[in-house]
Amino acid sequence: SARSGTTIIGKVIHSLKGVEYSFEPPALFSLIPLIESIKENNWKMLYETYLYEDFFINSICGRSINCNIADDSSIYKVKSKSSIDARLIKSVDKVKAEKIGADRVIAYKMPDITPFIPKLIEYYPDMRVIFMERGPIETINSLLAKGWFSKNGSTSNMTWPFVIENEIKIPFWVCDKDSDLWCAMSEIDRCAYYYIRVNNVNIPNAIKISYEDLILDPLNTVSELA
């Protein structure tokens, strides 16, 4: 079963016709936090190379799809076997892949990148953003249960990428000026900092989905995405 609201919504989006979906791409977790520190043309070249050349074309050709049926992000969870088989039984060159992909769109799921989305939208104004909303108490309780920001969690690789200071791994979404503050914080204060950091962002025209609505009334909630 899906582990979180974002995973559920990701599966719904992946199931839509003409959508090529990337689940938490590691390359973008490294690249997106650098959006302010790399020249715009260089950053966009790297971003578009990954999304289009590496992911999109290879997804259409059946080379970068997740065929592990045990994974929540498996293509077999959301697409018909016949449509998947059609990708896997023949070799497709780039010219043909581009023709097939002419009426398709790219979607990707990436939690925790909201502080960087305004700049991303500045670069790509037609980009559409779906934002999962969850209350602070529920979010903090969930984080405490996972222990990601505990003394042990802060030395693990659960939040990646990170920088290391005083043997503590500081998540990529922590402001540079707050590094020392993060190291001194208690676990619950880190959870509160996280909630504020990823929610206190103005994202114009974002589609907002309530986690509580998704759980209580999934059909009507996901119908907003159709």
Residue ranges and their predicted role:
Residues 1:
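P-loop (Walker A) phosphate-binding loop of NTP-binding proteins
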Residues 5-18, 120-124, 144, 208-226:
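PAPS/PAP-binding and catalytic site of the sulfotransferase fold
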Residues 8, 115-119, 139:
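Phosphate- and divalent-cation-binding pockets in alpha/beta enzyme and binding domains
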Residues 15, 21, 27-30, 138, ...:
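Active-site micro-motifs of SAM-dependent methyltransferase domains
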Residues 20-108, 114, 153-181:
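PAPS-dependent sulfation machinery
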Residues 21, 129, 206-208:
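Conserved beta-strand scaffold positions in the cores of enzyme catalytic domains, especially
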Residues 86-96, 112-115, 141-224:
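PAPS-dependent sulfotransferase catalytic domain
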Residues 109-110, 120-146:
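Conserved phosphate-donor/acceptor-positioning beta-strand/loop module used by diverse small-molecule
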